[in-house]
């Protein structure tokens, strides 16, 4: 049976149209599958990536005040209630440097990779080198700690800055442990001191209700920032160094112009003391941790609160963005560390392992590890697996 030319053309045209329609149907089906599959894939991926404890260090008999990785990720810096500053190799966790304080002298002890004492040097208040093993130097003297409450690295990792309980701030050589400068000016207890991203300036906070900006090279005070009505507990520069954000016991956060010292905004929302506050690495957001058991995410430009993260059952002592800005890590008195999705505020993981209040938790520079310190003197290293 033969078809007419007209019927044949109609058949071919219909077949061609049907083929095109099938392609569209398959495309639509594929997009629908992809639409529903991506969230599950993302959730599965997030569930697979969790932090597990790879090292527990009994660093002190007392509370850990601060712990962090060096900017290059090679070392670990910590300060405990015993006021000793310690650095360790991040690969084998052996002690590298310990800075102590004698009644009249600062003593730094450096260690080999195997943990043996390699060098011990002593300086007096005028930075003159002394022999710590000389009986005339330390005879009948009791060793005290470096008197430090917290400590952090300079951006280049060459210096360590620590705050002392007598209201002073000290800059140390990160390799030798030598005391380089003492910054004096606060009239009360100093809570924190941090370098600017360029390393040229230092911002400090105090119970005298002020922030101070210092010249990191000369140690001179450049500005005193006033505005908080209670103890200023923490301050941090923005990634571009143009702004400073501060947290206070007055339950507020303030954003300052780092150049003029002018208060640009006051962020209100927490109902209790704000313990720490930091910018996201991209500089667009601010994260804060409070005694009201919450973490808040703020728009750094408008100052509006974008999200409130709830989940901890007690005070939240610290919160920090991951280097890629995708996650936030928090530490709490409830003995847990939590990992949050910085975009939607969901809790991705609750890390348990500490047996006492977790004071601090911070990411490594590459974001694959977290270092945490607790009230019982334990430091833990968590790695993403």
Label each residue range with its predicted role:
Residues 359-385:
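Blade-level signature of beta-propeller repeat domains, shared across WD40, Kelch, NHL, RCC1
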Residues 76, 118-120, 160, 202, ...:
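Hydrophobic beta-strand positions that form the internal "hydrophobic ladder"
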Residues 90-92, 133-135, 174-176, 216-218, ...:
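Short loop/turn segments that connect beta-strands within beta-propeller blades
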Residues 71-72, 113-114, 155-156, 197-198, ...:
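Residue-level detector of Asp-centered blade-edge/turn motifs that repeat once per structural unit
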Residues 82-84, 125, 166-168, 208-211, ...:
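Short coil/turn segments within WD40 beta-propeller repeats
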